[in-house]
């Protein structure tokens, strides 16, 4: 997968720091997950469109097992919106760009 400039890749070491401030939408995924692969271009598009408004990040559940366990991620893809380090919304499954963009906007104030 190509590295996108505005798309953060988080792991157990940097997760807490990166979600601590602002609005952050995190996509919990697995490389072996078909629906996760379908969601990737949508998440990449969000990273571009939300630049300056919200951070968009991905977490590979197989590489960040501690974070995944702490947040009780049981299905992928799972998207969690954090505001100032606190979870404000969790959605499971593939969602379209408009839904996710609206979700971010609804929590941006």
Regions flagged by a language model, labelled:
Residues 1-22, 106-109:
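N-terminal leader/targeting and pre-domain segments
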Residues 11, 60-62:
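Conserved acidic residues
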Residues 22, 29-32, 75:
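Short pre-active-site segment immediately N-terminal to redox-active cysteine/selenocysteine motifs
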Residues 25, 38-59:
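Conserved helix-turn-beta segment immediately C-terminal to the redox Cys motif
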Residues 27-29, 81:
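Structural cue for short, hydrophobic secondary-structure segments
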Residues 33-36, 79:
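The canonical Cys-X-X-Cys-His
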Residues 65, 71-80:
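Structural micro-motif
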Residues 75, 83-109:
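Non-catalytic, surface beta->alpha helical segment in thiol-disulfide oxidoreductase systems
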């Amino acid at each position: 997968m190509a590295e996108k400039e505005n798309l953060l890749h988080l792991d157990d070491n940097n997760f807490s720091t990166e979600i601590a401030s602002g609005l952050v939408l995190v996509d919990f995924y697995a490389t072996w997950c078909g629906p996760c692969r379908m969601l990737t271009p949508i998440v990449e598009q969000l990273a571009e469109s939300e630049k300056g408004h919200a951070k968009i990040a991905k977490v590979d559940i197989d590489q960040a097992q501690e974070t995944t366990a702490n947040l009780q991620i049981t299905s992928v893809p799972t998207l969690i919106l954090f505001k100032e380090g606190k979870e404000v919304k969790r959605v499971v499954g593939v969602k379209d760009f408009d839904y996710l963009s609206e979700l971010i906007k609804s929590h941006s104030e």
